[in-house]
């Protein structure tokens, strides 16, 4: 209703009188103050804080399986065509690994266009990243185009076994329908091969070296390829986590490499990294980044 008069239109169609877009803009968000200003003529006096509240930009959760992949893409200075989902947060600092986001499925069709328009010049330094549910929604036809029209491009499907962005809904790859009942499960690897992609491989995004190896190998091949980055969403109830990590202060030299992954479980206190054990899932991404082995199991 913030943008389009959806409920308002339905009310009017039912013959009901209602107040809507003649008072509220179709641009920007609604707020309590805006509603009060339009309905009673003045906004209520709010509480003024002496100190400004620090900003809290959106960030991928602690233990998010997408974090390791995006760190690897950023490390290798690749151009990344993103898509719509939790992984869109890969565009946010400090990862800042996503270069474009247009609409659902545009990553796959976009990289196909890149490959053709650049006549191969961008093939070894550009990838598309799309989620499992978004791929099922609108990425399949783009992949068919890549196979049929022979694009030398790599698509990375980030498979977290759920539709995380909108509240953990099931999708055709999970084996359950929206009611939670068992349903036919789409095999992503078999589907990609059936669409004409011969090079399909699966990696664990928690394994940074394996991710980097897979990406480099697929980018070096003159053929369309798919990498499936597979690990369940860290917020799924059935996912078992490792013990939280802790910082060995004797080994830590405050190089801040562990901060480059952008994990909300790690913060700096007096210039030293500190792990919040209530958030840490023990995924080990930060441990792999530390050259001094200063992050240990708690």
PLM region descriptions:
Residues 253-274, 281, 285-298:
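Iron-sulfur cluster-binding cysteine motifs and their immediate structural context
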